[in-house]
């Protein structure tokens, strides 16, 4: 049975360790000495003077004792401060629309040296092929990519149609892999709480590894039952009261700042000296446009310090050591002997202005991330094949036969994945409340099912339509529009290009982004993706949409494990009651 001590970054090979010891005995030269540098001690909360000596990818000495030691290379850091490399404690690379190698090229220079990812987006599309590809990528990446094994594919059995199931036998086969830390977010919390045998078998199989959680708004006895089954963390916490209960019950709270779900400001007050070992940071779902304009984990650290007056040592602690400690990664998260030399150099702690980054003792700006990307991607054999399959859609299929009465409407909440369960009156011509648009979810795995139809409020589309093949977690096509003709045009365009995002206005596609890899990922550079996302944002504003991230927000309308009202290919789903409901209230 695998254990965490066998995982990536956990061990120093015997030959390297012997060399490190010989350097400390003054018998050989180390690889790199950082001089004119201080370092942040996250345990005592102090900045202490360097230098720092690195050998075989690891820190072997810090402080005045380093003056006794010599190295092959000496680098003057010009008074900068060394802090541990940042760890994104929960994320989906696919949600960035980038390949893992492009994600590495984009975020490693920003100081994110490790990521704990759940590839369940791609696994929902193509099963174990998706996990296999991520693990192949992890073997040749400089960034530490840990791959959690997707626990709920589909998110909840029977509620949606996806591209592939992922059985327990298939899941168990990955336990021994050195880049696998455990089970990814357990979204089917009713199955956990109700003690369903299939779920208990999954938890038991991975019991000696990490068990990641997903429990939005869960509290009281339900939360106690969830935690009692061994679930260790949650990234779906949205308010302080919820966070305090989870912390008190032994869960780590992973604070999220994604492209839509922005919970950092609400949860920042949770961070104290006492709680900080159990407070982690994550992006979950963050696209290249946000990364380019704001940053990644570095943005979160800066916000904690500058907007919330969190002491710098606590902000850096929750961005690194807390996550390393939580996941049992004993050689990550500190600037101390025996730890991997994953280091960010900043001019001041409060500015979080990263000057240089080291990964395993190598300066990132001296690596060949750009030139090696294409060869690495090709060698990884990405699973490129046609996954967006459906006959062309007609206007008639998207028409909802509305009659006077009360209708359930999905109420979108700005910058939240949670939705409201609205009831709106239709007088035979119009809805009493403005801004109600048509919504359709269309199965795209070749079953040729008719569209599932519903209503949504919050996008405020005045004309045209927007569509995406990124629809968590099953990734069927989601389309929202003011009229059926525009909606059909948008869907059919996605079918033609093999998946992606698009905007239709006055019968024309005004912006799009192709996602050929599983219908959810691009093969382009992050800069081009960010530019195309910017074009999409401009195009959606032109048809009346005011949401800051409409495509990300609409992609979660089909995820039936986040309250309150969602829409899958099987119909309208009330998450609070955990049952399908009719569109018309009196039906």
Swiss-Prot record:
EC number: 3.5.4.2
Class of this enzyme: hydrolase
A molecular function GO annotation: adenine deaminase activity
Catalytic reaction(s) noted: adenine + H2O + H(+) = hypoxanthine + NH4(+)
Regions annotated as coiled coil: none
GO terms for biological process, alphabetical: adenine catabolic process
UniProt KW Hydrolase keyword: yes
Cofactor: Mn(2+)
Keywords tagged on the record: Hydrolase, Manganese
SUPFAM superfamilies the record matches: Composite domain of metallo-dependent hydrolases, Metallo-dependent hydrolases
PANTHER family: ADENINE DEAMINASE, N-ACETYLGLUCOSAMINE-6-PHOSPHATE DEACETYLASE
Family of this protein: Belongs to the metallo-dependent hydrolases superfamily. Adenine deaminase family.
This protein's name: Adenine deaminase
């Amino acid at each position: 049975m695998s254990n965490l001590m066998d995982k990536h970054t956990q061990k120093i090979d015997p030959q390297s360790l012997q060399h490190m010891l010989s350097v400390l005995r003054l018998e050989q030269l180390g690889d790199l000495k950082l001089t004119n540098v201080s370092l942040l001690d996250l345990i005592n909360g102090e900045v202490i003077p360097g230098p720092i000596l690195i050998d075989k990818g690891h820190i072997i000495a810090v402080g005045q004792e380093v003056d006794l030691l010599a190295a092959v290379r000496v680098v003057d850091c010009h008074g900068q401060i060394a802090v541990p490399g940042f760890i994104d404690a929960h994320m989906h690379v696919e949600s960035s629309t980038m390949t893992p190698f492009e994600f590495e090229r984009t975020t490693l220079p920003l100081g994110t040296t490790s990521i704990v990812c759940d590839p369940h987006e791609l696994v929902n599309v193509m099963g174990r092929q998706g996990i296999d590809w991520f693990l192949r990528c992890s073997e040749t990446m400089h960034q530490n990519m840990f791959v959690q094994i997707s626990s709920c594919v589909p998110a909840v059995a029977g509620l949606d149609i996806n591209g592939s199931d992922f059985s327990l036998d298939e899941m168990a086969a990955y336990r021994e892999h050195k880049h696998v830390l455990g089970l990814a977010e357990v979204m089917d919390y009713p199955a956990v709480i109700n003690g369903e045998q299939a779920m208990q078998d999954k938890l038991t199989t991975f019991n000696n590894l990490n068990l990641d959680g997903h429990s939005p708004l869960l509290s009281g006895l339900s939360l106690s039952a969830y935690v009692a089954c061994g679930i260790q963390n949650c990234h779906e916490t949205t308010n302080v009261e919820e966070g305090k209960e989870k912390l008190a019950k032994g869960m780590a709270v992973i604070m999220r700042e994604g492209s839509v779900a922005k919970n950092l400001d609400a949860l920042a007050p949770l961070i104290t000296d006492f709680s900080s070992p159990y407070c982690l940071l994550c992006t979950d779902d963050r696209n290249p446009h946000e990364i380019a304009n704001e940053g990644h984990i570095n943005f979160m650290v800066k916000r904690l310090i500058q907007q919330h007056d969190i002491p710098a040592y606590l902000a850096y602690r929750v961005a690194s050591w807390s996550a390393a400690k939580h996941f049992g990664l004993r050689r990550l998260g500190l600037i101390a002997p025996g730890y991997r030399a994953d280091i960010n150099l900043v001019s001041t702690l409060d500015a979080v202005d990263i000057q240089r980054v080291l990964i395993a003792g190598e300066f990132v700006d001296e690596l060949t991330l750009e030139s090696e990307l294409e060869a690495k991607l090709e060698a990884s054999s990405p699973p490129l094949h046609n996954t967006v399959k459906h006959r062309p859609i007609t206007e008639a299929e998207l028409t909802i036969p509305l009659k006077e009465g009360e209708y359930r409407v999905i109420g979108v909440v700005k910058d939240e994945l949670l939705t409201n369960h609205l009831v709106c009156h239709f007088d035979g011509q119009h809805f009493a409340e403005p801004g109600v648009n048509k919504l359709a979810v269309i199965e795209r795995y070749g079953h040729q099912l008719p569209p599932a139809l519903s209503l949504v409020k919050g996008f405020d589309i005045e004309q045209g339509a927007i569509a995406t093949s990124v629809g968590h977690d099953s990734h069927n096509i989601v389309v929202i529009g003011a009229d059926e003709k525009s909606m059909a045009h948008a869907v059919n365009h996605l079918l033609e290009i093999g998946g992606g995002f698009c905007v239709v206005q006055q019968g024309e596609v005004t912006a799009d982004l192709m996602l050929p890899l599983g219908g959810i990922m691009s093969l382009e550079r992050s800069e081009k993706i960010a530019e195309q996302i910017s074009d999409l944002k401009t195009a959606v504003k032109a048809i009346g949409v005011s949401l800051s991230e409409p495509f990300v927000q609409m992609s979660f309308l089909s995820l039936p494990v986040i309250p309150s009202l969602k829409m899958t290919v099987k119909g309208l789903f009330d998450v609070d009651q955990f049952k399908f409901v009719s569109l018309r209230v009196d039906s």
